[in-house]
């Protein structure tokens, strides 16, 4: 798929949840087009609907939630045929999408890793399932992913367990697993929240590198506008289940239009690099 081609299109999407007899309208008529190769940041405070919105792309809504109207169309499939994600109901259909087409990195890497399996086995499982490699070929590919995400001594680390890794290293492993699935779209849900500032910057830089090397489209979910200044091509600002403003990073940072965007910007202190200022 060529850069800047439409890869995902959301039209008038509405999602509701039944909560003890009451209806919560979580997503309110969102329209959004996402293009191959871009990094789109979705920014908003906790409870604004960011995670609910993107989980709907993978059929991961809680049992009491559902898409009540609107469409989600995916255009990145190998056969070139669009897939209407909003119409998928069966788990077997979603299994064709999850991982291979759209993968997700969660906020806490420990919830994504099996504490009873070695790091190498967990990455290799994704390689075997989504790339069809076996044995020595799968192992060598796994070592390659460990190197790509910046983990030193991959042959040694291959045999170690999650508790033997720091938080930043675990997040690198989770990124390796996601990329090993060969996805077109990588959703990163608050991937740096649990990390200190220095490690945050390293993980964001790694995501930029993975985007280029593996030809990914990245959707970055965060409550902090400060972490997206030097990674996002576009920024969508969410408030109360709707996208209230969308634009390039420069437009959002230097010429915000919506009062909520102003409020988010006023809550952070940014040190702009010369590249960002240019």
Walk through the language-model features, giving the residues of each.
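Short catalytic/signature loops enriched in Gly
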Residues: 4-6, 81-85, 152-156, 248-274
